[in-house]
């Protein structure tokens, strides 16, 4: 997966969405793999659109996880993709980093900017799990 960067937002009304803080900004991040040392997981949450995380070129699934540091209510995820993207992926939430629930399962990913809203839920950890890529 070539995730460019990811933003997580608290659940607020639509009018406030543009002013909502990015809950993932500079939070600790981990991933199943990295393509190289210039594409580390923390670059996906540094707020810079010129940096990104990219998984190693190997079999899927691949995952990327953010630790928000405390339980927060999450209701929206924005993903900005590089050239490659995931066709089939899940956004999963967890309060303990062990037990996950699916907030979204998308099987028609298109790349570009994907703005994903879902029923607001409490979570400390947010995980992207890419099942299949659009481009290899």
Predicted regions mapped to residue ranges:
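Hydrophobic h-region of N-terminal signal peptides that target proteins for export
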Residues: 7-16
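Short, conserved beta-strand segments of beta-strand-rich sandwich/propeller modules, principally
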Residues: 76, 125-127
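Linear, non-domain "peripheral" regions
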Residues: 117-120, 130
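Positively charged n-region of N-terminal signal peptides that target proteins for export
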Residues: 1-4
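Disordered, acidic Ser/Thr/Pro-rich linker "stalks" and the adjacent N-terminal cap
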Residues: 17-74, 80-89, 95-99, 105-112, ...
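Short beta-strand-plus-loop segments that form exposed binding edges in beta-rich domains
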Residues: 129-136
